[in-house]
Amino acid sequence: MSALFNWLRRQNARLLSLIVLVLIVPVCLRAALGWSTPLGFLSDLAVGSLLVVTLHRRAWWLALPVLMFWALLAIATAELVSAVGRLPTPSDIHYLIDPQFVENSTGGGLAHPALAMALLGALVFWLLTQLVGRGLSRPALPRSVWAAPIVLFAAHWGAQNLWPNDGDAWRLYNLPHQLLASEVADLQIQAEEWLDGDVEEPTPAMAGLTDVDLNGQKLLAAPGQARNVLIIALEGIPGAYIRANREAIGSHYQEDLMPNLSRWAERGMNTPDYVLHTHQTIRGLYAMLCGDYDKLNNGTPKGVEMLTLNERNQACLPAQLREHGFSTHYLQGAGLRFMAKDKIMPHIGFDATHGLEWFSNSNYLEFPWGKDDRAFFEGARDYVGQLKKQKQPWMLTLLTVGTHQPYSAPEDYLQRYETPKQAAVGYLDDALDQFLAGLERQGVLKDTLVVITSDESHGIDGVRLASSWGFNLTLAPEQAQLPRLNVGVYGHVDLSTSILDYFDLPVPTALSGRSLFRDYDSGREIMSFTNGKLRYHNGQGIFSECDLPRRCRYYQSTGFIAESATYKGTYSGHPARQIAARADALDLSLLRTPLNHRYQFGSNNIIPLQAQIKDDWADNLIGAQYLEMPKGSHTRVRLTVRSVDPQQAAYIQLKAKEFEQDVQLGLPAEMIATADQPLEMDFSFENPQPRKAFSFHLLGYGNGAVEVSDFSVITELPGQEDILDDVPDDETAQSS
């Protein structure tokens, strides 16, 4: 111990411990995480050297908060890249001090605990040298050392400009460096725009993104022979999990997590270049079923906006098929209230909409969101059996939930795979295989058009555009006439048009997109917004990727999804604003403003309560999620909750969250509702800054059940007439 104490009191011990913490440990961790690139190491050294020269002779109590925050950023980087494949942004930073958000995001644990332990150990070692060496003088660093950060940052900047690299940001940058570079670029763009002056931006041509295109050559000689339609949406599955897709684009990703689905793909038509336009289940379902882009900016989901409209919803696929004689059905493994699917699905044309409450079979494993995938598909098989008994043709849309965080799988799967996420995917693959094999034995595949796809992509670390890479596997009775690989760029906006075109039914002009059952001899425009990046392909070989709103890189790329693309340069100014203008125009396809629309999330449904609240998301009693509130607006909320059982009280909590972080609105922590004295509230709050992804979580517990007869939300500008009082109930955003 005395030898260690003497070493810790050496004059250079504090400097060496700081170098270990901010230079050696980050470089080693980058290598261990598999993020090894010359630019990444250069960025680590630049940030580390800056910390060394800045903190070496500072008092320990000044340096410690800086180093703790730096270490927290490093941990957050690894965790967020592991979870969703992107670096944290400035809007994420304040979430790091929210314990509930951290717990919900990590499932109570870290994806990379060794990284956190290494940083903590190095930080404790540095602090020990500071405390033991108190009173000892610190030698000044040579003047040449002060130039090291400048030289390293300049070298990184020069390398990026002389030999541009389009790799993932976390492979090229240390997070503080990336945030600094982004801020500098923003200031540069603002200066350029200030020098240009106020220039009115012309409206870009939108026909290529919004019009129906049926000009391709039909793949089928006659209208499709299928009697029924089955759409299976798999939660979060990227296109790279299908072997045929990987081979078609030459992907380096070779993990075969879904071998069964890949074997089914050998029997069907695959579309390798298939674009998912946004994150979130409700947005993916809207694009699929209503032939339109959902918001490309985290605004109010268009499915919620659709509740205010009584004409556009009739153009959605379920309504169109119902009009042509189909019975239309929606079944998912989770509860329906979250994201208001209990209201949206009937409104767009489903005759029957069912969630967790429909299932009578037991789960095979505990899962907070609802049915595990094996139990779900067993229930879905019974549902199809009921549909087969009717004479009417049917359309059934299925949505799984088992591959949603937190990933759950049986113990034997967890032993077989490296991560719970992979185990959950493998469990889904086996369950889906058994379901499809059962349909084949029952003869369902002989007269049913089956489309297997995903609602969104949970991404894959190190796979280019994985967050936007979807898949579309089509199994049709006339499969021999269809190609195994469908060449061309398609996306979720094409699905409704495609199915109507398959049956040779008229396609409403309100829909967008191309038909998967036609061969086109020209490119097409298409967009996506995932992982904070707006992406646009102009249909003429140029793919652009923009950090919102005014800074873009562009590449030469024949299609949208590709293993690699030829980097051509960067641009800002008018071309970048035109891409943003296209996204803005798509966002306004339903409503021109988020103001003055009353959303009614209440209903006369009886909702059983649990003995305790387990999860703010899965236990939500209403679907008021991911709303948008403009800057300077005023939001008013009115609610009525009644306990159904006269002998039982219901204990109610109301929380507000923005981007999943709690927002304090001054509401009571807990309230009571009884049959004789319902809980009635009417409150409002200001929006001094824009709010997006704003959600209400109405939670309850007790031994009885409740009725949420009213949960009205309206956002308006101060001084406007209060629509919440004046609009009749039958003109509000609610479905029948």
Residues of each region from the PLM?
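Transmembrane and membrane-interface helices of multi-pass
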Residues: 2-185
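Solvent-exposed soluble domains appended to multi-pass membrane proteins
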Residues: 210-608, 689-693, 710, 714, ...
